Amino acid sequence: MMLAQKQNFMNQFYKKYHYSIQKYQITDLLFFLFLYPFSTSYGNEQFSFDSRFLPSGYNYSLNSNLPPEGEYLVDIYINKIKKESAIIPFYIKGNKLVPCLSKEKLSSLGININNNDNAECAETSKAGISNISFEFSSLRLFIAVPKNLLSEIDKISSKDIDNGIHALFFNYQVNTRLANNKNRYDYISVSPNINYFSWRLRNRFEFNQNNDKKTWERNYTYLEKSFYDKKLNLIVGESYTSSNVYNNYSFTGISVSTDTDMYTPSEIDYTPEIHGVADSDSQIIVRQGNTIIINESVPAGPFSFPITNLMYTGGQLNVEITDIYGNKKQYTVSNSSLPVMRKAGLMVYNFISGKLTKKNSEDGDFFAQGDINYGTHYNSTLFGGYQFSKNYFNLSTGIGTDLGFSGAWLLNVSRSNFKDKNGYNINLQQNTQLRPFNAGVNFDYIYRKKGYVELSGIGWHGNLYNQLKNSFSLSLSKSLDKYGNFSLDYNKIKYWDNAYDSNSMSIRYFFKFMRAMITTNYSLNKYQSYEKKDKRFSINISLPLTKDYGHISSNYSFSNANTGTATSSVGVNGSFFNDARLNWNIQQNRTTRNNGYTDNTSYIATSYASPYGVFTGSYSGSNKYSSQFYSALGGIVLHSDGVAFTQKAGDTSALVRIDNISDIKIGNTPGVYTGYNGFALIPHLQPFKKNTILINDKGIPDDIALANIKKQVIPSRGAIVKVKFDAKKGNNILFKLTTKDGKTPPLGAIAHEKNGKQINTGIVDDDGMLYMSGLSGAGIINVTWNGKVCSFPFSEKDISSKQLSVVNKQCNRPENSGD
């Protein structure tokens, strides 16, 4: 290759992969050593090695075919499935390099060792681990583990939870709407919040101004704390009830409830159990499609297997029983679920005590509420609850069960007593996923005896006017594969006084034609208060125009009703920048009524997501009116390292810091870049789950080197976790070193340069080439090997080039260093 081509190849290869090397403080030159022989002596057979082969702390020249002991960054595979990359200590045993795996490390990999082996390096062979092999050429560690030693790898312990930083932070939203240049409406929302250890204080205040009328109110104030080991969440103050049995209400008091986010999906989500009878010693194989998720031997008699395998994704299971004579029996297990259903043996509860807010109770009456869900065996969940307040009591009980091919069914019966009124409520639900037909069926039926009063109704003294009698809803969905999707929804509601009875039906068909996405919809609505049925047909067409520069789409919609009103709209919308932080929309609407009146409306809107907030503006107008709207949404975080102006913080978020370096893209949220002081807020994380914080390396300037572009955090609920990425700002340079006697420092010699608190390191290759990154200004680089040392200076002139260039330097030994 030509020299320019070689250097360009090295540059691109280095920029793509050097972050993972720096993560473990292994110099960038290690990476270059693998690449450089190909770029300078292409086609020659010379010694080279993968940069990751060198363990941390390795500081002598290489002169052996046997890999040295030390710590290596390796990819770990459990039963041929990659689990993680980690630094593992290795030592020489016999004539090979073997890993040092502690009991704690094995546990973090999901491997259970049930002995008292607390040594630094556990005796894996005695623990039952069948085979461990290390593939040195690719730095892959393979561990073969019997199934009985495997636990759920995604399970998280309390010591893994990050409660985040102490912080005072504010979320704000400011809206202004101006109609016809005279009528003005202003809205301001401010949420001052405090995080202290695992305690969360949450507040929200709102200000409204409609022309001259002004109101200011507090929405809520509450204190919250999570207890991970107990899997519960505590709230004291003003909040909302949360229940699978009852509707939700606002209250002031105390709530203790199971936090389902603290469980992994396989711990809490319902999955079926496989039951059967083996006539003799038999092999049981359970498949989902072509994937085997259970392969076990059982003795003669009844058997039962809970489906806990992480490979199970729901749907039909095929069970095969093979006895000792080779005879086979096969049957199919279908399953469906409902939100109330839980894993067998798991209990989920919620208990609340306090006062109802006045909008639910005229006098703010005291009330108490509790509900429990318990997953039983035989694919069922039992649930029930109670509510009581002044002159009011409600008791509810129910069951959700999976009946196989006919789907999941729920039956819930509640009875209420309020003063002289009493009644009951019956709810029957069904959900069936007919996966062989790519179809789903759901219905929900409620019957309510007159006299039944919900808790929210006691504020109206149990007024039975306009009380629900029954309701029925049915939903059908069918995938037509390449021909699109079809769905039908039907709803019927009836009241005891017939005042607000209604029927509605909607038929929807979605399909693609070439690049266009087309949705058609027909709806029919009948209301008791209107004699005429409302019939509507609509069609919506969306056509992507480009995806090369931004994302631009055109859209057209048309709607026609039997009332004589027809509406059409045509427009174009899109986004700019790779993360779609700038969005825009232009629409032209036309409405024609049966009296001949026609209204034309124009609409234009744009929004921009910046590191400091999201800003929106829009304008709409016709020949009779105009409207302008402006909005700003953001946050301010005060913490031990200063102040960060950010986008609005979600319930759980991460504050990312890259040492005073701005404009670095973090994650996928539009507009999330590091600000002027190097801070950025990732607004939405999943509590008690593994969240990956990823830096977009495409936008990193050439003069910035990051030790790592990916980190993982497990935040508690409401936490703001701080994630710091170490960065070096400076140029990258390749030195060609010679000593005073014309020789070169040996392969493996260590170079280091100190710039304040930052230490830059590198390793010399077998041609005396030294790659250094993050160099700025002028300084001295020291090179050491086998107790010997030499040094050389560099200047701004040496590192001024933006391209990777080779600079010749003589490395001189101090007089007292010896030979």
From Swiss-Prot:
Q: Which Pfam families match?
A: PapC_C, PapC_N, Usher
Instruction: Identify the keywords attached in UniProt to this record, alphabetized.
Output: Cell outer membrane, Fimbrium biogenesis, Membrane, Signal, Transmembrane, Transmembrane beta strand, Transport
Ranges that cross the membrane: none
UniProt main location, coarse: membrane
Source organism, top-level taxon: Bacteria
- Which GO molecular-function terms appear in the entry? fimbrial usher porin activity
Record's bilayer topology term? Multi-pass membrane protein
Cited InterPro entries: Fimb_usher, FimD_plug_dom, PapC-like_C, PapC-like_C_sf, PapC_N, PapC_N_sf
* Subcellular location per the Swiss-Prot or TrEMBL entry: Cell outer membrane
Gene Ontology BP terms = pilus assembly
GO-annotated cellular components = cell outer membrane
Into which family does the record put it?
Belongs to the fimbrial export usher family.
Q: What does this protein do?
A: Involved in the export and assembly of C6 fimbrial subunits across the outer membrane.
Task: State what protein this is by name.
Answer: Outer membrane usher protein CssD
Q: Which organism is it from?
A: Escherichia coli
